[in-house]
């Protein structure tokens, strides 16, 4: 128990926060700086703007900001070739076979069948 508490304390002390953003490839993404005096760690062009904001060209990239208080904000940009909501008609939207709701129901049915078969064999 003490080891778990110690590991939890270490994880909280490191304070690494993750931010995920999807965007359309080739556009500019406007993000807010997590801390005003942070250090930028990344290899993509970074354009600081007013009001603690910055702009990046949307490509699949990974970068981070290290704040003065030791908190590290890690950003992951995922570029799409087109917008996911663009050109989608309502009648073309269909339910996928492996949606989370379907998988939960299938798992419950499977577990119920396993216990039913086990009781019949005993």
Swiss-Prot record:
The chain crosses the membrane at residues 97-117. Residues 16-81 form the X4e domain. A motif (Di-lysine motif) lies at residues 118-122. Interacts with the spike glycoprotein, M protein, E protein and the accessory protein 3. PROSITE patterns: X4E. Residues 118-122 are intravirion. The keyword Transmembrane applies. It comes from Bat coronavirus Rp3/2004. This is Protein 7a.
């Amino acid at each position: 128990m003490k080891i778990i508490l110690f590991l939890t304390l270490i994880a909280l002390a490191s304070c690494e926060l993750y931010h995920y953003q999807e965007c359309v490839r080739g556009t500019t993404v406007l993000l807010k700086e997590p801390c005003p005096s942070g250090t930028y760690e990344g290899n993509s062009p970074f354009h600081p703007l007013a009001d603690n904001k910055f702009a990046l060209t949307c490509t699949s990239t990974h970068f981070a900001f290290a704040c003065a208080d030791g908190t590290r904000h890690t950003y992951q940009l995922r570029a799409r070739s087109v917008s996911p909501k663009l050109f989608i008609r309502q009648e073309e939207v269909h339910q996928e076979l492996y949606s989370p709701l379907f998988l939960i129901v299938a798992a419950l049915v499977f577990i119920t069948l396993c216990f039913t078969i086990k009781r019949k064999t005993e």
